[in-house]
């Protein structure tokens, strides 16, 4: 199919997370939907749609993060590939799912490296923006490599065509916004091909992360107010346990450090605030 594909799999309003169906009893049955999605988070990120691609705006740290996370993803996927492609498009032939893609901050660099990238997000405005941006900034020959889908990860994983369809999944700065991490990870396992990688970056739940990633970050306008809830942060031990419980093999985790004075990221020996983790489906 030529050009990008825009798919919206929303089956309800983003503000509604349950539906009522007839029941044989005296009371209607309520079926809860999208248990990995928090409507408060959806509302918050819906307000940021126009800021996603501003490299000097409130989300600039995500843009600068590409300078370290893209090489990390690239290096690991080159190890995973059985053949070596042209250096200009080293990810050619790989299909990647970017979960919680926003408007494509990470998706587009991966596309330019040759990957077919499906960006998944529950915010309709982000999907619309990503689709529009793809048409505007990607060369015509790359537009068919970009697809933005409006869906939760568990809804997406419920579709037969998506099962074991991906060579890699990236969940960068996402799991700290998910109310049901176990369901999220189980759904990702269903989507990945065997012997494929899943990449996480997130925030540890420590006293230091409360001070640095919430109070200072929001107080200094490094992140939009209300972006992070410390209680949702996931420790490396918890993330490892969730992955092992869902039949992943954990390779390693590494600390990350962000310097807001120069808007730069670096790998760090300490993981008390930000960290990255690599796991694989056997």
For each feature predicted by the language model, list its residue ranges:
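N-terminal chloroplast transit peptides
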Residues: 1-13
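N-terminal, positively charged/glycine-rich alpha-helical extensions of SAM-dependent methyltransferases
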Residues: 18-59, 63, 67
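Conserved alpha-helix/loop element of class I SAM-dependent methyltransferases that forms part
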Residues: 64-92
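Conserved SAM-binding loop
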Residues: 85-89, 94-208, 277-281
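Acceptor-substrate binding/catalytic loop of class I
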Residues: 202, 221-238
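Short, flexible, mixed-charge acidic loops at enzyme active sites
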Residues: 209-219
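Short alpha-helix
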Residues: 231-247, 253
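Core SAM-dependent methyltransferase catalytic element
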Residues: 264-282
């Amino acid at each position: 199919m030529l050009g990008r594909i825009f798919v919206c799999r929303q089956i309800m309003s983003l503000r509604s997370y349950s539906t009522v169906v007839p029941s044989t009893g005296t009371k209607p049955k309520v079926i809860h939907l999208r248990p990995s999605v928090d409507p408060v988070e959806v509302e918050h990120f819906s307000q940021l749609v126009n800021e996603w691609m501003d490299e000097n705006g409130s989300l600039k740290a995500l843009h600068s993060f590409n300078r370290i996370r893209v090489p990390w993803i690239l290096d690991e996927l080159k190890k995973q590939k059985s053949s070596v492609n042209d250096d200009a498009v080293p990810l050619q032939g790989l299909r990647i799912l970017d979960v919680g893609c926003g408007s494509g901050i990470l998706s587009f660099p991966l596309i330019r490296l040759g990957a077919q990238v499906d960006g998944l997000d529950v915010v309709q405005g982000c999907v619309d923006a990503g689709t529009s941006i793809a048409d505007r900034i990607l060369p015509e020959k790359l537009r068919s490599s970009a697809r933005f889908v409006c869906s939760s990860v568990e809804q997406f994983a419920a579709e037969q065509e998506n099962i074991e369809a991906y060579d890699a999944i990236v969940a960068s700065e996402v799991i700290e916004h998910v109310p049901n991490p176990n369901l999220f990870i189980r759904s990702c396992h269903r989507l990945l091909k065997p012997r494929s990688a899943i990449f996480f970056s997130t925030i540890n739940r420590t006293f230091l992360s409360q001070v640095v990633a919430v109070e200072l970050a929001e107080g200094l306008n490094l992140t939009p107010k209300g972006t992070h809830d410390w209680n949702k942060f996931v420790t490396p031990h918890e993330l490892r346990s969730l992955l092992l419980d869902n039949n992943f093999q954990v390779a390693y985790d590494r600390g990350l450090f962000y310097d807001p004075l120069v808007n730069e990221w670096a790998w760090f020996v300490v993981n008390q605030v930000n960290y990255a983790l690599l796991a694989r489906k056997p």
